[in-house]
Amino acid sequence: MGPTSGPSLLLLLLTHLPLALGSPMYSIITPNILRLESEETMVLEAHDAQGDVPVTVTVHDFPGKKLVLSSEKTVLTPATNHMGNVTFTIPANREFKSEKGRNKFVTVQATFGTQVVEKVVLVSLQSGYLFIQTDKTIYTPGSTVLYRIFTVNHKLLPVGRTVMVNIENPEGIPVKQDSLSSQNQLGVLPLSWDIPELVNMGQWKIRAYYENSPQQVFSTEFEVKEYVLPSFEVIVEPTEKFYYIYNEKGLEVTITARFLYGKKVEGTAFVIFGIQDGEQRISLPESLKRIPIEDGSGEVVLSRKVLLDGVQNPRAEDLVGKSLYVSATVILHSGSDMVQAERSGIPIVTSPYQIHFTKTPKYFKPGMPFDLMVFVTNPDGSPAYRVPVAVQGEDTVQSLTQGDGVAKLSINTHPSQKPLSITVRTKKQELSEAEQATRTMQALPYSTVGNSNNYLHLSVLRTELRPGETLNVNFLLRMDRAHEAKIRYYTYLIMNKGRLLKAGRQVREPGQDLVVLPLSITTDFIPSFRLVAYYTLIGASGQREVVADSVWVDVKDSCVGSLVVKSGQSEDRQPVPGQQMTLKIEGDHGARVVLVAVDKGVFVLNKKNKLTQSKIWDVVEKADIGCTPGSGKDYAGVFSDAGLTFTSSSGQQTAQRAELQCPQPAARRRRSVQLTEKRMDKVGKYPKELRKCCEDGMRENPMRFSCQRRTRFISLGEACKKVFLDCCNYITELRRQHARASHLGLARSNLDEDIIAEENIVSRSEFPESWLWNVEDLKEPPKNGISTKLMNIFLKDSITTWEILAVSMSDKKGICVADPFEVTVMQDFFIDLRLPYSVVRNEQVEIRAVLYNYRQNQELKVRVELLHNPAFCSLATTKRRHQQTVTIPPKSSLSVPYVIVPLKTGLQEVEVKAAVYHHFISDGVRKSLKVVPEGIRMNKTVAVRTLDPERLGREGVQKEDIPPADLSDQVPDTESETRILLQGTPVAQMTEDAVDAERLKHLIVTPSGCGEQNMIGMTPTVIAVHYLDETEQWEKFGLEKRQGALELIKKGYTQQLAFRQPSSAFAAFVKRAPSTWLTAYVVKVFSLAVNLIAIDSQVLCGAVKWLILEKQKPDGVFQEDAPVIHQEMIGGLRNNNEKDMALTAFVLISLQEAKDICEEQVNSLPGSITKAGDFLEANYMNLQRSYTVAIAGYALAQMGRLKGPLLNKFLTTAKDKNRWEDPGKQLYNVEATSYALLALLQLKDFDFVPPVVRWLNEQRYYGGGYGSTQATFMVFQALAQYQKDAPDHQELNLDVSLQLPSRSSKITHRIHWESASLLRSEETKENEGFTVTAEGKGQGTLSVVTMYHAKAKDQLTCNKFDLKVTIKPAPETEKRPQDAKNTMILEICTRYRGDQDATMSILDISMMTGFAPDTDDLKQLANGVDRYISKYELDKAFSDRNTLIIYLDKVSHSEDDCLAFKVHQYFNVELIQPGAVKVYAYYNLEESCTRFYHPEKEDGKLNKLCRDELCRCAEENCFIQKSDDKVTLEERLDKACEPGVDYVYKTRLVKVQLSNDFDEYIMAIEQTIKSGSDEVQVGQQRTFISPIKCREALKLEEKKHYLMWGLSSDFWGEKPNLSYIIGKDTWVEHWPEEDECQDEENQKQCQDLGAFTESMVVFGCPN
């Protein structure tokens, strides 16, 4: 420093004399954001102090300081080097509820002996974190979402608090709201939500917040869609994470496909590339390729030419900055499954790296080392590892990046104060100069106090720290040698997760420029911390100086505690489905561990929103209150940027923090970072209190009542009924299957001897997508604090990889998410039954069972069977099994297609079993298939009504009658569901903005002068402080300025006391007569100031007493005997008209404002107020001036007397309904309108208020100026009151009740403002009219929507494609293979129904049973010059070619594309199952069309019997008419008396109606031999139905008689319209006519028929 001139040096010395003599400096340090209900630390220091220093720390509310939120005491002693700390907690008081969303502050005060140090600190209302875990990431309609909420504080330890939870639909509307407490739950709240069947598809949200901090919302998402889990996953991986634009080779990409159980996929991939520019996507059609996936992978390249040709301006430079995406669709050779995957965000770059300085401080200390933390990323943002970087111009300064992409470069800086420009570049050898990345930054010098050039530099080694290691922190000092001996220690502070973790001192000996602090890293330091250090001294200038630095240090992310899930098995065997397995959980003793196992297929569909430990740390890091990677522009900047406040007794302090968020983007990016068992299973799924309901539901019922009927006898509430019904239905279905399994003993062939019988194969049937939603407490004796728990679990039936996810919560170590533990479950022979999400009733579909043989060298001969289920029409019947024998080569698969027609809606079971010949190997799979009704699902809006009972009701009650929906086009035998939706309509009340704090600066003035002038001076400051307090605007005005303003008010108060007379009244001068108005005004101002400064109540109440006793007349009027000199200060009272009314109103207002303070001291006060009020009320109607109407109106409103005619006068006086104005004086009008606004607020007339406030705001009157005292005071008092009282919404409190005829009681809902947006929903299956009644305030909306299935006009099962398939016998001339029994030609024609040709498309052809395609024909189609197809694929097993896949390069949109090839029949089967052809686009399975084919059946359709839209299967053996005489009487009697036979009739055929598919025979019932369920009378007619294929077998003739009997299961339809089906079990026998009985050949039959009839009628059946 240069020499200082004499006088100014002297001045400096004088100014800082006490400091120069070494007076102590007291300092307080706290985080610059304090959090509610969290333990916070304050560091206290007394530098250069002697002896003990007692310290009291108090925390007050701001600005009022009315409450002590916390108070702590401590003593700083020489033994602790006068350093200490206190911890305090700020309770979540009402004070901190911020309705207007404004920031909240507290005043933190430390009193060191007599010296007070205080600081206003920002408060965060966030009281911890909430983490949400769902059991899956994606769900189907009708399934259940299981979720957990983890409640933790800022230290991530469990807390018990009330949590509000909302579930929102994709439109953002909440459909469920809950309030729950995590008290005694160890921070884990388990919840669930049942997704309705009718639900909006898309991304749903779970949002949660702590009740006391609603503004801090934590959320997670889950997807709802109709899907089927895939069997494999596809990964698209470019060889480089970027595309270098000048790379001639192009972009190389590997497509990997693996089954979920780990085996490699064989198939075909369709790959297309595209360019992404922001939201816009341009696909590159020329890049579309089909590649084989062999042994699980395939390669594809996007050439540079295809890329450049695909864009309009093929300049390479124009593509830089954009990115590439690649989409791959992989289809299995069997065609049974298809999975899509995409990789996007592959940047197009000129350099493969990017350099960032986000981890480098922005400030350097001149002449000291500067640590550059260079963060190098790959273009996708992931950290780049082992990349050399150097500083340009200083080639010696080089470093390699570490695993997190960061390299440390230290450079020496020049001692000058100039900004420093630094350029860093990569030095990767393989890259040319042009390809290296380069970046420049500018660092600014740290500024010292008075240019002292005293510095401190903190430096740490660049390593990835882990808990348990030691970090050496270097403290480097640079300062004036003359003063260095003064630095005996450094104070250091460690900030972590927004709190002061540790504070300490590091001793320094004289002469030490470098001091090292060894810092032990513990788990408390995760995920990162800031170390701040400082020293203080009195410098050469005699001025106290603080010098500081800080450094940000990253710590390896891991759990604070420990949690590992692994296998507890000793031997490493491959787990198989249903097997028991042991899990080993190792974690912190006493922790609660929650588990879930998820099928990996779920993550193939959606891998977002999984809860991981790194996500937890990301949330914590986002909440970091520090804002930079270290250092700062000066000492105060260092503290502020690290998230600390520093305040000292010598005037040093950090700037006021007024925002919770950091000013710029975060300074850091984290690293890329058999029945009984089933019964017990079922019961275990329910909570304890509902288990009894479930157990009872599964008990046998002696009366054989249905489950539904049994629930009517339950009185334990709806939840119990629901569980009972679920468990009852479950066990009924199980019993049914069990019974079926034990009765199906059908004939077997000799072949079956060396093979497991079908009934001995237990099918796999439990395929949950997630399970193991368990809670385990680790109470086992610990070893080194770790408890080990062994858990036995039974694996589910899926063949997949399960991801077992575990989260632990410990009250000592907090939350920990373990790495997922994978369990792969498989067997070497199994069936994968691929079912669609849903199928339509009565629509023929093809499903596929894929058989896998993973045996190394063994070909397997397998018998596979589709089991009969009466809910489907298929080749499997009660009488005949649908079995096939197939051969599967080793390590391959085979697809077996089945054609079925579903006949019943709901969940129906499909079961396939397979057994291997000569091996004891089998598998079975039973899955549920969702069958939906025919027709189109329609949502019909029945009614939308606005509920507003005040406006639309009668005497406050609104009734709405809602009609039933018109369902005339509904599909028969389907249900409808009506949803009644209710929602409140929250109407926001626009509140006018507060006057900006900036505009009030001129009001803070110093009062002076006589008793009147002093009040003129004091008024603006009092009202300004009051206004800023009420509107919470100090942070705008300057938080530190409030104290100064209070000092001015104190000064004004003290000065005013000089003008108080012995009578307690006030005058301009002590000797002057006291003034009524002035005394009342002093009372008014002081009453307001009581909340700001200490005011003696005797001063205030003495003046009140004087006004009542000396100046109030018996009629209540107040009189003025000594008017004020400064008439300009009395505002609108200056006008002499209506003086008595105006003055009385003015004094009365003052008395009422002092009432709370003086009521006890002045006994006459209530009486005085009443008298004055009586006077005003009596004379109010005669008032002429708007001013008097306003001021007297406010005085009366305060008393609750402004009503009726008075109120009417008050309101009608307002001009344009927005101001109370007398011509002439603008200031009087502002004052009068302000009184009127206060009156309106008192009346809570919020409809009238807004225009008045708007008018006042439009006057742009901000106080001040001559004659403005009253206008200033009143306008800000009124506007402050408005900001405080004005509601931000209209009142909403609606009671809505629904009376549904089908329900015995009313359904009621109460809608409040808080829950207005919640969508309340009621469902009913009845389509009925009902009544809605609404009462209360506010508005709501009622919507009624009925969902039903409507008959389709022309049902199109095809989307975007037309398809025609024909099969005909081949001409005799065609040559056929030797072993072929028959040859036919299959012709397929297709066309795309789009605007242009379809690109690559696929024909998926399943062959008819026993048929295979001619491979020579296929080769010719693929390899001929006229290539019709691009490629074909057949199942590898030669003799059982079940599926053929043909790839087409394109499908024309303008004409039919046709191809034909021969198919040969190699073996005969009794019944040929139809084949299917499906055409679809490679990128979208929805764009498809399916057709069936069969040699004998039109369209390849299975026969089914439909009548009045009811269908059943008829693909069974036709009945054969009993016509020969071999049938004996006994046989007839035995057969007619078999169980199940319902009726026996003698009938006469009246009429035959033939049709295309089914024939109807109208029979007259001549005699009822055995009556059945149909109460038919003799002579009545009944319809018997038979499929046309049985016409020949039946040969029925009109007018002939027949003996008929049949089963009840052959009835069709409902009474009284019952029809009878002639099925395989129906007996039809010609009954000869009387004349025919004379013939000898018929005599025996006629006698037997007579005897049969007599026996049946007289004796009936023996059983």
Curated annotation (Swiss-Prot):
Subcellular location: Secreted
Outcome recorded upon mutating residue 1115 to N: In AHUS5; leads to impaired binding to the regulator CD46/MCP and resistance to cleavage by factor I
Keyword Secreted: yes
InterPro entries: A-macroglobulin_rcpt-bd, A-macroglobulin_rcpt-bd_sf, A2M/Complement_sys, A2M_N_BRD, Alpha-macroglob_thiol-ester_cl, Alpha-macroglobulin_TED, Anaphylatoxin/fibulin, Anaphylatoxin_comp_syst
Site keyed (Microbial infection) Cleavage: positions: 541-542, 744-745
Outcome (variant: residue 1160 to A): Minor effect on binding of C3d to CR2
Signal peptide (residue range): 1-22
Post-translational modification comment from the UniProt entry: C3 precursor is first processed by the removal of 4 Arg residues, forming two chains, beta and alpha, linked by a disulfide bond. During activation of the complement systems, the alpha chain is cleaved into C3a and C3b by the C3 convertase: C3b stays linked to the beta chain, while C3a is released in the plasma. The alpha chain is cleaved by the serine protease complement C2b component of the C3 convertase to generate C3a and C3b following activation by the classical, lectin and GZMK complement systems. Phosphorylated by FAM20C in the extracellular medium.
Anaphylatoxin-like domain boundaries: 693-728
NTR domain segment(s): 1518-1661
UniProt entry tagged with the keyword Cell inner membrane: no
Listed result of changing residue 592 to Q: In AHUS5; leads to impaired binding to the regulator CD46/MCP and resistance to cleavage by factor I
Residues annotated with Phosphoserine modification: 38, 70, 297, 303, 672, 968, 1321, 1573
Activity regulation note: Complement activation is inhibited by VSIG4.
Covalent cross-link Isoglutamyl cysteine thioester (Cys-Gln) as placed by the record, residue numbers: 1010-1013
Annotated GO biological process: amyloid-beta clearance; B cell activation; complement activation; complement activation, alternative pathway; complement activation, classical pathway; complement receptor mediated signaling pathway; complement-dependent cytotoxicity; complement-mediated synapse pruning
Feature type site, description Cleavage: 747-749, 954-955, 1303-1304, 1320-1321
Quaternary structure annotation from Swiss-Prot or TrEMBL: In absence of complement activation, the C3 precursor is first processed by the removal of 4 Arg residues, forming two chains, beta and alpha, linked by a disulfide bond.
Protein name in UniProt: Complement C3
